[in-house]
Amino acid sequence: ETVYDPGNGQADGSLIEDFIEGGNVSLNTADYIYYVTLGGGSNGENGLKTITDSNFDLWTDGNVATPTADGAKYTPSLAEYTSNRSLKRDQVEADDNWEYVGVFAEGAGGTDPAIIQNVNDQGMVGVVMQVSDDTLPRGAVITEIFNNWLPAMFTTTAVEAEGKATSTWAALKADR
């Protein structure tokens, strides 16, 4: 099975699109996100465009990505490297449906690793070291994103129960 059929045959409602639109996170590493599918079928650059309903392309060969302040804070294994498939800042910022929520490295050509979020459904798409180079510490960087950055994004806030509807209702019932 695949989360997205080859040939961009599912303009809407694919497993991966529904997963993202359900408020989940999809990360990719090594090369162009959603480009190739099960059995080597090719979606090309339109895979990303179709799944995110955007005009994003990742053709950024030779983008020297330098860790940002967040990169240093959350992904200490990340060092400067050359990315070939970075998210382009101008494209993301021009799209009303997507915004950056995490930029761990950036160069003149774009951002990678980086995570963007759909402002309508809160789903996230991220690229992590998208270049054909097996010497890069991809596993360490992705692990650090999961262990250090994601928990910071999904913090819980304590709610003071006093005066809330359930507390008030309980007090009213107790007084009867």
Name the predicted role of every residue range.
Residues E1, V25-T29, G102, M124-M129:
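Structural recognition of the beta-strand scaffold that forms the well-ordered cores
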Residues E1-E45:
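Helical hinge/lid and interdomain linker segments adjacent to catalytic or ligand-binding clefts
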Residues V3-D5, V101-F104, A158-V159:
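Intrinsically disordered, low-complexity segments enriched in polar/charged residues with Gly/Pro
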Residues N8-G9, G13-I16, G62-S83, R138-T143, ...:
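Short, structured coil/loop segments at alpha-helix boundaries
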Residues G13-I20, R89, F146-L150:
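Short amphipathic alpha-helical segments and helix-helix/interface helices
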Residues N28-D121:
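An acidic, glycine-rich "communication" segment
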Residues N43-S54, G109-D112, Q117-R176:
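Extracellular ligand-binding/catalytic regions of CAZymes and related secreted enzymes
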